[in-house]
Amino acid sequence: MILQEGLPLLYQQFTALFGKNLLLSWRNKRATCLQIFSSFFFILLIFCIEEAMKASDASSSAYKNITDPTLLVSPPILPCEDKFFVKLPCYDFVWSGNNSRRVTDIVSAIMANNPGRPIPTNKVQSFKEPDEVDTWLLSHPLQVPGALHFVERNASVISYGVQTNSSSESKRGQTEDPTFKFLVPLQVAAEREIARSLLGDPNFGWGLGFKEFARPAIITETTSALSVMGPVFFLAFSMFGFVLQLGALVTEKELKLRQAMTMMGVYDSAYWLSWLTWEGILTLVSSLFLVLFGMIFRFDFFLKNSFVLVFLLFLLFQFNMIGLAFALSSIISKSSSATTVGFLVFLIGFITQFVSATGFPYSSSYAVSRRVMWSLFPPNTFSAGLKLLLDATSTPKSSGISWSNRAVCEGGQATCVISINIIYQWLLGTFLFWFVLAIYFDNIIPNASGVRKPIFYFLAPGYWTGKGGNKVEEGSIFSCVGSVPLVEHNTPNDKDVLEEETEVKQQAMDGIADPNIAVQIHGLAKTYPGTTKLGCCKCTKTSPFHAVKGLWMNIAKDQLFCLLGPNGAGKTTTISCLTGINPVTGGDALIYGDSIRSSVGISNIRKMIGVCPQFDILWDALSSEQHLHLFASIKGLPPASIKSTAEKLLADVKLTGAAKVRAGSYSGGMKRRLSVAVALIGDPKLVFLDEPTTGMDPITRRHVWDIIQESKKGRAIILTTHSMEEADILSDRIGIMAKGRLRCIGTSIRLKSRFGTGFVATVSFIENKNDNNIGVGASHEPLKKFFKEHLKVEPTEENKAFMTFVIPHDKENLLTGFFEELQNRESEFGISDIQLGLATLEEVFLNIARQAELESATAEGNMVTLELASGISLEIPVGARFVGIPDTENAENPSGVMVEVYWQQDGSGSMCISGHSSEMRVPQNVPVTRPPSPNALGHKSLRQGVRGIVIDL
């Protein structure tokens, strides 16, 4: 199949990624509608605020035509509780002059004759002198609206004074007028009762009325709600798209979705252009709706200014925010942080809006450098543009800014440093700045795995030409702690591994490019640097971790190479290095001649590989059919063949019935099948399958095995798995890693013959219905004796139906004659069938893993406790097989006794003790290393736990 390249591939990837963005937005309708139509709610809110301001003004008499003012007749003294912000307990009024009997009677009459409400005596305070009143007022603020001061001059003259707080207060939009509310009622009451007292007629009528002059309504140029609240609301509206865009980009990075596309060969240019185009369309639509809604609600800002000018301001500003979101997404690694950063950007923009409103720094009094730095933050330039357009429509007589006057300075100045035309130029320039910076950051800032390009990667000719993939580049490894220490290379202990390493080194030295070799690994090493943590009064530093320690290996075409190993062996790290996910610390690997340490090389490699990662990397909102169409387009399949290829792969992995179901609804096994199909799309030359059948049912697993077997032709496959059956059936060669090193390599039969315990003989018996009461041992004792006499072995498993024996390799020369005799005596022993085979691959795997654990435990001192049946506790290294018991030497056992320890892997993949044999004699002439012990330990002290003796047999 011929794949597309160059510009046709770029266009195909762009359209596929654009379609993906469109589909994801469609399936997240709520967020998309919010981004497009949120402007309506902001405009509506501004409109409601402005109408409320107009209604508040209309309720005031100052803004009404008064032709016949209302007459106010004898207003009463109000309760003190009616005063705004009064403190309790309060008093309706206080008075001075209580040394005069006549004055006291006048005040009593004021209280009794108050219109509509007599004033209780406990609501009035009396004093002798005005100074006493002042003193009381100072010590009791806001507890009384006013005071009356009386002086009896003579029998016909009584003078008085009114004292009130002339400060007006506002509450809930209403202003309190102390003159008409408190002063006038006190004055009217005092004059009325003084007149009655002087005339001696308590029924003397005293009526007083007053009204304001007739006048027209006051016409003022009130401040528009849009001019006050608009800049903040417009910024908040634009932040919806910014936060959603930033969150989407960071989520794709966090969930490794972009990494999956990168491994399949997506162009960075196609990725960024697809996002820019889609977000640009959303921005254009949302900006258009904002302006239209503003015109519908009849705001002068939108009606008087040129439609194009207003639309361009919002459009270019939101484009700037897209560029800023791109740049920030290269730095942020967690989607949870994206919302926080978005709020922080809004908060900073909110603050700088007020600074920009003062004219800073867009005036000739500020240096150009300040304007440049200030304008790099998009909300600042946006605020300046809003100010120009708002000022142009600030009064009813203002005509706004037309398109032809866009370059004219504010106020008709001959020269200025800012105009709406200059604002547009700034917005265009800063968008390009942020967009280019985003692409640069995306290449040089290390991702979660530490991969980056050199700082001046764009100066390398290969970056533009795509050539030079076999040249190793510096700068592809990043570490925040400086240089990473390399592990020392050790000569392999295994002869097959040494032979493989020697062959690869010789080919590299001779410059031989074997066309039958797909992958050639040259001393691959990966070390994770230690970390430093500052705690309370101490600094904790961890040592570097060597995940892969010098791997040399060839992987041939048309073969499946299976890489086995316990958890932490380095399998997934090796695959991550080969696919370019993780940078290598040392060594290199050539995949069809391209180096994984070259950015050009890894780009070429990704065009010819397929990857099924250890953990599924899928979009929950996309179906399996849509996944395959997307990755087929990224790979460069001809458009005409994409549909048929996807249908075939879905049929191969039995997902045809669920082709249109979203992946988020799939089970774990279905997701793994989809990941396998994605890895095989585009006819890759090299396929990485990292535990591909995890979570599958047995029937589906067998079916996927058939697919993998059929896929070997014309390509190399690298498989990792924890299923020994899967490795045994599928692999042409097997390599077992442990502790970062390759421990053995070869075919399954080769490994079984070298590292297995021997041959496994299974003898099945003829069913005998008459021996129900005969024990197993009694019925098969002759056969057990036959094996014991000839091969010196005991059964490892036995029951009525069969018996299993493990025969050591050193008995191989006896097997031909032994089994000929056994076949001749089948009827004597009641045998129905005899099977002979090698040890299982699982046994080989456990032996290799156990030996690696023993080496590590011996070097690092990792010990576990072995509890013997006798109650003795022994401290033994992890992985030790034969362990001698100290101080058990006697005449019968001159070398002491030992036990064989059985090991297995626990749920986490770590080695743990599963049991041990009975005590047996230590063979003579076997060198042993005794544990350090200052004193001879008796049997009693063994119960307290001592170090066992490792015996190498």
From Swiss-Prot:
Binding sites annotated in the UniProt record for ATP: 565-572
GO cellular component: membrane
Subcellular location: Membrane
Domain ABC transporter: 519-764
An annotated Gene Ontology molecular function: ATP hydrolysis activity
Disulfide-linked positions: none
Alphabetized UniProt keyword annotations: ATP-binding, Membrane, Nucleotide-binding, Transmembrane, Transmembrane helix, Transport
Pfam families in the cross-refs: ABC2_membrane_3 (PF12698), ABC_tran (PF00005), ABCA11_C (PF25158)
Key word Hydrolase present: no
Family label: Belongs to the ABC transporter superfamily. ABCA family. CPR flippase (TC 3.A.1.211) subfamily.
Official protein name in the record: ABC transporter A family member 11
Species this chain originates from: Arabidopsis thaliana
